[in-house]
A protein has these predicted regions:
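Membrane-embedded alpha-helical bundles that constitute the cytochrome b-like, heme-associated redox core
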Residues: 1-188
Length: 188
């Protein structure tokens, strides 16, 4: 029985493949200076990082296409249901041998991963676009202004440099969270 069609597999591997390259190149941009220069030297590091930066910036768009396509294909199958509560109560069958809790197309664990990837992927994509086009976006000022309309009291008067600093921080935190979650997804 074929569970997923060609378009489903294409969407998954477009998103997954680009994510792996984005994770490696992003980690290199963040930590490579400290880890790779002692191993390869400054010249080799500069070449690796320059190529990695271009790959990171261009493959980001492949990730966004994979993310959007995955949302269109699978969002309706990932709406939580009462059956998911039963699946969660049984621990997904991980703790008892031979126990396989009922689920529809996707179980509750897969649904959690799906929504975390959709929300985290959208968030990291938006902050990534803001980083690629500096001084042209005000993602944090705009987001904080919207939150202020529902009762928060957050600052909205950021300089362009402060916006970029917040984008870098957010991009790194969300990316690390996604990498951690995807490692767990692959392992389980």
């Amino acid at each position: 029985i074929q569970r997923f069609g060609s378009i489903d597999r294409f969407a998954h591997w477009l998103m997954a493949g680009s994510f792996v390259v984005l994770a490696i190149t992003g980690l290199n941009l963040l930590y490579g200076r400290h880890l790779l220069i002692p191993l390869f030297g400054k010249e080799a590091f500069a070449t690796i990082t320059t190529i990695g930066k271009f790959a990171h910036n261009y493959l980001a768009f492949a990730f966004m296409v994979g993310l959007a396509l995955s949302f269109v294909l699978w969002a309706r199958h990932n709406i939580p249901s009462k059956l998911d509560l039963k699946w969660l109560a049984m621990g997904g069958g991980i703790f008892k041998k031979g126990v396989h809790p009922p689920a529809r197309k996707f179980n509750a664990g897969q649904k959690v991963i799906f929504w975390a990837v959709m929300i985290g992927g959208l968030s990291v994509s938006m902050s990534g676009i803001a980083l690629m086009f500096p001084f042209q976006t005000s993602m944090f000022a705009d987001t904080f202004a919207m939150l202020n309309m529902i009762g928060f009291n957050l600052p909205t008067d950021f300089t362009a440099m402060q916006e970029q600093q917040l984008n870098q921080l957010w991009h790194g935190i969300v990316s690390m969270g996604l990498m951690t979650m995807i490692i767990a997804h692959i392992y389980i």
